[in-house]
């Protein structure tokens, strides 16, 4: 069995990790670390776990676990790792943004690999250290990578993506209160969202002359989980040619489905799936990409990476079905 530790155990991504890992056939959850809830049952923070798992939060870490998931606020993983040493064999998967960019990937002798399996699977299998991608970054990259592979990203890309309230984290803020978020929408960080950097680096990895603008408008939705992203750009390929290229690119990727039908977010919520829909009008291509921000956009993808790191089928423990209604 793979002994797992979870750091920052009170948040949404940690709760999603626990929800999936408690049924993973190859995993034992060794500890869930939270200084604020130490000694209390996991169900104090994760009410959906009541009656399903008898385990308490702890303020002590086991440095000898096989893998540790860092579910800390952005910028906090570095300080945690400086203050807490793990065994040399312990694999680390960081769900924050501390190590995602190339310039940040090397830390105290550890080289973090960007954990997007659809382009970095071989490297993920060999590494002990993963920088898990951001949620928006995952949906957007999966929408664009086949175009980059064929050097078709030669014009500005217009991106509009809406995320659920869980994307803001468990701590309350002015824009996460029910009275503000319900029956409401707003955009934020227009043209300057922090995920743009990691998206750009992955696109250049496949299309080395990529220098077009990614004009990204992120939106806050009034639903709890999921990302619905629409992207459009110019492309001379026919719809049939594009579908063939996308299907070829993702033919060995079990969590990505390509279609030309209309799609809706409920098709992926609470799963590790990404569904991509293609539409063509003249020389414009519309790409719609949907994921669950907590699963494929965070915890599910982290488990997918863990599976690859330990030589398991990447789908192990991730055969999850959306409710659809």
From Swiss-Prot:
<dbReference type="GO" id="GO:0003942">
    <property type="term" value="F:N-acetyl-gamma-glutamyl-phosphate reductase activity"/>
</dbReference>
<dbReference type="GO" id="GO:0006526">
    <property type="term" value="P:L-arginine biosynthetic process"/>
</dbReference>
<keyword id="KW-0963">Cytoplasm</keyword>
<comment type="similarity">
    <text>Belongs to the NAGSA dehydrogenase family. Type 1 subfamily.</text>
</comment>
<feature type="active site">
    <location>
        <position position="135"/>
    </location>
</feature>
<dbReference type="InterPro" id="IPR000534">
    <property type="entry name" value="Semialdehyde_DH_NAD-bd"/>
</dbReference>
<dbReference type="GO" id="GO:0051287">
    <property type="term" value="F:NAD binding"/>
</dbReference>
<dbReference type="InterPro" id="IPR036291">
    <property type="entry name" value="NAD(P)-bd_dom_sf"/>
</dbReference>
<keyword id="KW-0028">Amino-acid biosynthesis</keyword>
<comment type="function">
    <text>Catalyzes the NADPH-dependent reduction of N-acetyl-5-glutamyl phosphate to yield N-acetyl-L-glutamate 5-semialdehyde.</text>
</comment>
<dbReference type="GO" id="GO:0070401">
    <property type="term" value="F:NADP+ binding"/>
</dbReference>
<keyword id="KW-0055">Arginine biosynthesis</keyword>
<dbReference type="InterPro" id="IPR023013">
    <property type="entry name" value="AGPR_AS"/>
</dbReference>
<keyword id="KW-0560">Oxidoreductase</keyword>
<dbReference type="Pfam" id="PF01118">
    <property type="entry name" value="Semialdhyde_dh"/>
</dbReference>
<dbReference type="Pfam" id="PF22698">
    <property type="entry name" value="Semialdhyde_dhC_1"/>
</dbReference>
<dbReference type="InterPro" id="IPR000706">
    <property type="entry name" value="AGPR_type-1"/>
</dbReference>
<keyword id="KW-0521">NADP</keyword>
<dbReference type="GO" id="GO:0005737">
    <property type="term" value="C:cytoplasm"/>
</dbReference>
<comment type="pathway">
    <text>Amino-acid biosynthesis; L-arginine biosynthesis; N(2)-acetyl-L-ornithine from L-glutamate: step 3/4.</text>
</comment>
<dbReference type="InterPro" id="IPR050085">
    <property type="entry name" value="NAGSA_dehydrogenase"/>
</dbReference>
<protein>
    <recommendedName>
        <fullName>N-acetyl-gamma-glutamyl-phosphate reductase</fullName>
        <ecNumber>1.2.1.38</ecNumber>
    </recommendedName>
</protein>
